[in-house]
Amino acid sequence: MSEEEAQKMLYQLQMLETYVADMSQRESALVGVMKEAAAAVSAVKGIGEKGESEVLVPLGLGTFAKSKVSSGEKIVINIGAGAAVEKDKDAALSYLESRIKEIEIALRDTSAKRQEAAANLEHGKAHLDQMMGQHSHSTSGNV
């Protein structure tokens, strides 16, 4: 293996390492979103179970206000791009559950890509080690 080939392979392995790290970060972010979505579903399900529920409304910077929510109230859902819609409890749950399914698909896809890249990275490292070992044996015999 020439020095140029070794450098090229090393560069490719570094790119794969970066990609694997990026996929790991995406996985972590998606897991966080999944937890938040599950908490939202749980909270929406709990609204109105006992008639009127007391909740904390976030005001920003870790500041909250107590409020009461009745079972008949609409739930406001952010649908992206700064837009929000009002939905009844069942429609809100349906929307949240569909979003969870989308997140699960994205998480599976990201995980599969990370695993494939990690396997390619390990294979590439082993191949590089093997080639470097063969190169050192051939050069030590020429001394």
From Swiss-Prot:
Cell compartment(s), UniProt: Cytoplasm
- Give the molecular function GO annotations: unfolded protein binding
Its BP terms in the Gene Ontology are: protein folding
Keyword annotations from UniProtKB, A to Z: Chaperone, Cytoplasm
Q: Which protein family is named in the record?
A: Belongs to the prefoldin alpha subunit family.
Query: Subunit composition?
Result: Heterohexamer of two alpha and four beta subunits.
Protein name according to UniProt: Prefoldin subunit alpha
